[in-house]
Swiss-Prot record:
One of its GO terms (biological process) is L-histidine metabolic process. Its EC number is 4.1.1.22. The record marks S97, S98 as: Cleavage (non-hydrolytic). It comes from Clostridium perfringens (strain 13 / Type A). The lineage of its organism: Bacteria, Bacillati, Bacillota, Clostridia, Eubacteriales. It is an enzyme of class 4 (lyase). This is Histidine decarboxylase proenzyme. Residues 2-11 form a propeptide. It catalyses: L-histidine + H(+) = histamine + CO2. Keywords: Decarboxylase, Lyase, Pyruvate, Zymogen. The active site is at E215. One of its GO terms (molecular function) is histidine decarboxylase activity. InterPro entries: His_de-COase_proenz, Pyr-dep_his-deCO2ase_N, Pyr-dep_his/arg-deCO2ase, Pyr-dep_his/arg-deCO2ase_sand.
Length: 320
């Protein structure tokens, strides 16, 4: 692209007195609006407006009491993980591995930025050195997970869910295990708990490189103490982010930051548990787009979006 032309298209927008923000001209159309008023849809489905997509983060768990059909038990526990927290129930989940590319944007970071991110209130959990010596700052993914709940809603308070029966490409993995009812040594495939991770690493050159999703999931077999499992997962974060650095090395991609989060559950005796990590690639419901248009989502915070939608916050009921 002609650099002078691009410079002319770059703009500074006024957000109030002594409050200006710079908006860089996009090189790629990232508009992502579904054909439905109240439903999001899967990326690549017919009828969408724009060439872009939106990545939404979710980690959840679900459990069910074991019956005499372990296959059906696995289906139900997976379904419960889908509907818990941010609601992604009733979808045909297709698997991608696993990037948010140059046409994609992240809900809660790029679009309707979570207030804690917009105000630069979050602090790194730790740092790792990347292949070129650049530090990779690792942040808690809680703001992005909360943003997903605010967009999709919950099972009891649904908002802009994906269309029932929609075909939705997702970065996803899951783990399923049975905790025996009897107090006996565990057999292969049995566990006391299950867990899942999601990590999203943002490239430092997002016009030319993709953001990386890493999903991980597994079984907890040591004991039935949830605090021990939580401690293991807190330590395991560094293994997950090690894989981020190594994938960056493979493609010579340097990341600006990583968001990482996990979910876990200790099953009751006689239960089957599922831990799901997923990031749906969606186009936004028409009514989820402010009246100022899709680009306005790049300029507003999550709380401003909630105000525009006239929603109360689901994760912080005292705030909109």
């Amino acid at each position: 692209m002609n650099k002078n032309l691009e410079a002319n298209r770059n703009r500074t927008l006024s957000e109030g007195i002594h409050k200006n923000i710079k908006v860089r001209a996009p090189k790629i159309d990232k508009t992502a609006i579904s054909p439905y008023d109240r439903y999001c849809d899967g990326y690549g489905m017919p009828g969408a407006y724009g060439n872009g997509y939106v990545s939404v983060l979710k980690v959840s768990v679900g459990t069910v009491k074991k019956t005499d059909d372990i296959l059906l038990d696995g289906i139900v526990s997976y379904d419960r993980a889908e509907i818990n927290d941010a609601y992604v129930g009733q979808i045909n989940m297709l698997t991608a591995s696993s990037f948010c590319g140059v046409a994609g944007q992240v809900w809660g970071h790029d679009l309707a930025t979570h207030d804690s991110i917009a105000k630069d209130e979050i602090k790194p959990l730790y740092e790792l050195k990347q292949f070129d010596g650049t530090p990779l700052k690792v942040y808690d993914a809680k703001p992005l997970l909360e943003a997903g709940i605010e967009l999709f809603g919950t099972e009891k308070n649904r908002r802009f869910t994906t269309a029932p029966g929609a075909h939705v490409i997702c970065a996803n993995k899951s783990a399923t295990a049975y905790r025996p009812k009897e107090n006996r040594p565990l057999k292969e495939g049995e566990a006391y708990g299950v867990w899942s991770f999601i990590a999203l690493s943002l490239s430092n050159d997002r016009d030319h490189c993709a953001d990386l999703f890493i999903e991980d999931a597994g079984l907890w077999t040591k004991n039935d103490n949830p605090e021990d499992l939580k401690k293991f997962l807190e330590d395991h974060r560094k293994a997950v982010t090690w894989s981020v650095v190594e994938c960056g090395r493979d493609s010579h991609v340097v990341f600006e930051r990583t968001y990482i989060g996990f979910a876990y559950v200790i099953m009751k005796p006689g239960e089957i548990g599922n831990a799901l990590t997923c990031a749906p690639y969606v186009t936004l419901a028409r009514d989820a787009v402010p009246s100022e248009g899709f680009p306005s989502l790049n300029r507003i915070s999550l709380s401003q979006w909630l105000d525009d939608m006239n929603f109360d916050s689901l994760v912080n009921p005292s705030k909109k």
